[in-house]
Design a protein with these regions (language model features):
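Residue-level marker of positions within ordered structural domains that often coincide
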Residues: 37, 91, 102, 181, ...
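Generic recognition of flexible, low-complexity loop/linker segments
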Residues: 72-73, 82-85, 183-184, 221-222
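Surface-exposed, extracytoplasmic segments of Gram-negative outer-membrane nutrient-acquisition systems
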Residues: 1-77, 85, 94-165
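Conserved structured core elements
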Residues: 59, 76-80, 87, 168-170, ...
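Membrane-interface anchoring segments and C-terminal beta-barrel signals
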Residues: 3-8, 134-239
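Surface-exposed extracellular loop regions of Gram-negative outer-membrane beta-barrel proteins
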Residues: 80-95, 180-182, 236-239
């Protein structure tokens, strides 16, 4: 957490969606709080979050993003992260794997501010697959507002709508091997022969599945390439 800032400052707002404030984690988002979609109109809803003289926030909903006040919201750094590596063997077989995990962190989807404007500026851009779940008729329950191509009321980029969890569990590495028995290798004058298969980034269980949870740079995602999934096969021979 931040314990002091330069001079007499108690907070500094950086870029469009970060705040440095005494008492808060260093990488804290500062955004207008998205409250879902109005089932009757399909418009985005926001909490006003205006502060009264006692410091209480007004949690009234509004469809006008300009009436909403940005507030500190979530943090980039996970509360818990780590990994587990295990090596198992039985007779001629061996198995090694590494799991990595992260819990409690968030990222800002900067790419989303370009491709999720609900029709305001998507004319020449690809849409994310989850736009298929957008609001389409009264009564629809979804968190994707209605799509109106060429709409004039552009979506606010500095909204918690674009803040997503980076919670995940990943099978980072896996190697499975088989060592030929000595009574086989002795016949061909070899000391050891091991055949193995290896892979990396094979499986990922993530709370937010639209981009890789390890991709964010300094809490932001902007078209970065995710870690590659790789496979390899090999033979080890000792004479």
């Amino acid at each position: 957490k931040i314990v002091a800032l330069d001079g007499n400052l108690d907070q500094v707002v950086e870029s469009s969606w970060f705040i440095r404030k005494i008492g808060l984690p260093f990488n804290t988002f500062y955004v207008k709080e998205f409250a879902g979609v109005d089932p009757s109109s399909g418009n985005a809803l926001y909490y006003k979050n205006t502060e009264d003289e006692n410091g209480n926030l007004d949690r009234t909903l509004t469809q006008d993003v300009n009436e909403a006040q940005a507030v500190p919201y979530k943090q980039v750094d996970p509360k818990i992260s780590g990994g587990l590596t295990n090596i198992l063997s039985y007779k001629w077989f061996d198995l090694a794997f590494t799991l990595s995990y992260s819990l409690g962190g968030y990222s800002f989807d900067k790419t989303g501010t370009y491709i999720e404007t609900d029709g305001a500026s998507e004319g020449n851009r690809n849409l994310p697959i989850y736009e298929l779940d957008r609001w389409q008729k009264p009564g629809d329950i979804t968190d994707i507002p209605r799509f109106v191509l060429g709409r004039s009321d552009k979506v606010s980029g500095g909204s918690s709508r674009f803040v997503h969890s980076t919670d995940h569990l990943r099978l980072k590495n896996l190697t499975f091997g088989f060592t030929l028995p000595h009574n086989w290798t002795d016949k061909v004058l070899l000391d050891k022969v091991r055949v193995y298969f290896s892979g990396s980034n094979l499986l990922t269980w993530a709370k937010w599945k639209q981009y890789d949870p390890e991709v964010p740079v300094s809490g932001e995602v902007f078209c970065e390439t995710p870690p590659m999934r790789t496979f390899s096969f090999g033979v080890e021979v000792n004479f």
